Amino acid sequence: MPPYISAFQAAYIGIEVLIALVSVPGNVLVIWAVKVNQALRDATFCFIVSLAVADVAVGALVIPLAILINIGPQTYFHTCLMVACPVLILTQSSILALLAIAVDRYLRVKIPLRYKTVVTQRRAAVAIAGCWILSLVVGLTPMFGWNNLSEVEQAWIANGSVGEPVIKCEFEKVISMEYMVYFNFFVWVLPPLLLMVLIYLEVFYLIRKQLNKKVSASSGDPQKYYGKELKIAKSLALILFLFALSWLPLHILNCITLFCPTCQKPSILIYIAIFLTHGNSAMNPIVYAFRIHKFRVTFLKIWNDHFRCQPKPPIEEDIPEEKADD
């Protein structure tokens, strides 16, 4: 017999489905844009594709699993654990992709003349692969023992049951809060976020320093270059800000759960925090469309060619510098 779904759960499911319906097509469009436009093939956009892949997976995999967990089916402990781990993997992948983007932008303004020889497509691919491998290690750590199995087994045996525990599948029931706070948040979320803030502050400082230099007749190109870098850096810093704004509330709630077990957390706050984390996967394509000219032009080209059946001339691969990003 299927589980009873309350009106509140139905509303929750409806919002989650809406987020998924925005996230998946939006991020597929980002990947599509990079594929069809040669001007979007540098290292930064490769890292953006990695971020978009993680966001597609959030909409196509994590949100359906979150809905399943919310309904609360009875499952074996390790089955529930496998359902809970993908969100950890994808979150870590997003963080590392954002860090790679920040480092890439720093190198573009710190060593502009040597950038293309230092940051090659091959090295970018290796960095992306490394990010995903590390994300798998961090996200799958609960599968290798850092979980709540011992506590669940004690309660299972105390009730006179045998075999692997069967539980109502809930995230906090299988994932250890010590893992979430001490390992996930304090090691793999908070330090990278703080490092990215420092990197972007340095990027803005270096760009402002260059832009404040006296402009001579021969310095037009550097001024244009750093002006473009400033616009892109602002857009990518906005992506970082939205990510932090979306994920920090849930991690703060996890800290409250660990350090103040008797403290009551209103359900509405928990749901808002969950919506923010999932909704973040739908935000990035919107930011790209409104803030990065190359993406906006390519999105419109794809829309006109494939959905309105009104082909336009091929995308210009070398967009003029003054219009590259507005």
Curated annotation (Swiss-Prot):
The chain crosses the membrane at residues 11-33, 47-69, 81-102, 124-146, 177-201, 236-259, 268-292. Disulfide bonds join C80-C169. Glycans are attached at N148, N159. Coiled coil: none annotated. InterPro entries: Adeno_A1_rcpt, Adenosn_rcpt, GPCR_Rhodpsn, GPCR_Rhodpsn_7TM. It is found in: Cell membrane. The keyword Signal does not apply. Residues 34-46, 103-123, 202-235, 293-326 are cytoplasmic. GO terms for molecular function: G protein-coupled adenosine receptor activity; G protein-coupled receptor binding; G-protein beta/gamma-subunit complex binding; heat shock protein binding; heterotrimeric G-protein binding; protein heterodimerization activity; purine nucleoside binding. CDD domains: 7tmA_Adenosine_R_A1. Its main location: membrane. Residues 1-10, 70-80, 147-176, 260-267 are extracellular. The keyword Membrane applies. A lipid is attached at C309 (S-palmitoyl cysteine). It is a multi-pass membrane protein. One of its GO terms (biological process) is adenylate cyclase-inhibiting G protein-coupled receptor signaling pathway. Keywords: Cell membrane, Disulfide bond, G-protein coupled receptor, Glycoprotein, Lipoprotein, Membrane, Palmitate, Receptor, Transducer, Transmembrane, Transmembrane helix. Pfam families: 7tm_1. GO terms for cellular component: asymmetric synapse; axolemma; basolateral plasma membrane; calyx of Held; cilium; dendritic spine; neuronal cell body; plasma membrane. It comes from the Eukaryota. SUPFAM superfamilies: Family A G protein-coupled receptor-like (SSF81321). Belongs to the G-protein coupled receptor 1 family. Receptor for adenosine. The activity of this receptor is mediated by G proteins which inhibit adenylyl cyclase. This is Adenosine receptor A1. It comes from Mus musculus. The gene is Adora1.
